[in-house]
Regions:
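Sec-dependent N-terminal signal peptides
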Residues: 5-15
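An anionic, turn-rich surface loop/hairpin at beta-sheet edges
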Residues: 90-113, 209-228
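N-terminal secretory signal peptides that target proteins for export/translocation
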Residues: 1-3
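N-terminal glycine/threonine-rich, aromatic-flanked beta-hairpin/loop signature
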Residues: 52-101, 168-210
Length: 269
């Protein structure tokens, strides 16, 4: 569980994105360049799951969060990314979370990125030499039941919000949902990597102010009330099951959380 805690670094990471614009872009971007469609075009093209020649997997999500699965290092990383343009080049800045969940400039990398629409590739170039550094192609599931990457990616495409925190008992609690709350995901994982998950349809009871999530596999349901606190955190009251206090996190946290639990934990429901 300690390793999981280290990489639970998506909390409020979206606030970092605005400060990640490269210096050269911040200084040289003109009003015309700011209106250029390159950034928007690249941003839309790169959403999804990609794989490079080394087998590393890159997941880019709509809230500017990032989830990397490094094959050689046998580890997963969370981070945030930002795109900017000087009118000629589009820069991709990727900032990875440190082991303690913090962010700093030392754990950051910048590429020039180009979407090769004809071949459906993402090309990453060195910003100084302009040499091609990596070519990313869309990830394709291999059909193996143990390959959950496409399932996680599909979930990431649906979700639009994520909240993460802890229960009263100190368990990690992750709640995510789509725009209208009709698809939700809840993951609760304890210090021994035992976990309970609910992934499926969500319904909101306006009269009682409760959310009910019915797992599409087990058909078990979880109901909790939602209270907004003064510090912008949420308290989720599950009745006899206790409560959890959560705050806004990135979509990558929801995706990685479920992946971690399935691959490393023991399912309890």
């Amino acid at each position: 569980m300690k390793n999981w805690k280290k990489i639970m670094a998506g909390l409020c990471a979206a606030a970092m994105v605005s400060s990640m614009v490269p210096v050269w872009a911040a200084e040289e971007t003109t009003e015309e360049a700011a209106d250029d469609g390159d950034v928007a075009d690249v941003s839309e093209a790169m959403l999804g799951l990609w794989k490079d020649s080394a087998g590393d997997i890159y997941g880019f999500y709509k809230d500017n969060s990032f989830f990397g699965q490094w094959k050689d290092e046998e580890q997963d990383v969370l981070g945030v990314y930002a795109l900017s343009s000087d009118g000629e080049y589009t820069a991709l800045v990727m900032q990875f979370a440190n082991d303690d969940g913090t962010y700093d400039d030392e754990n950051m990398v910048t590429y020039l990125v180009q979407a090769n629409e004809e071949e459906n590739l993402l090309e990453l170039y060195d910003p100084d030499s302009l040499d091609l550094t990596a070519t990313l192609e869309p990830y394709e599931a291999d059909g193996d039941e143990s390959d959950y990457n496409q399932t996680y990616q599909d979930m990431g495409d649906i979700l639009t919000e994520c909240y993460s925190g802890e229960t009263e008992a100190g368990e990690t609690f992750i709640y995510a949902a789509n725009d209208d709350g009709t698809f939700c995901s809840v993951l609760v994982i304890d210090q021994d990597d035992n976990y309970v998950s609910f992934v499926g349809e969500g319904t909101f009871d306006e009269e009682n102010g409760t959310v009910t999530i019915t797992d599409e596999v087990s058909e078990m349901a979880l109901t909790f009330g939602v209270t907004l606190n003064d510090d912008d955190t949420l308290t989720l009251d599950m009745g006899d099951l206790g409560s959890a206090t959560v705050q806004e996190a990135t979509l990558a946290v929801a995706v990685q959380g479920l992946k971690y639990a399935v691959e490393n934990g023991t399912e309890m429901n």
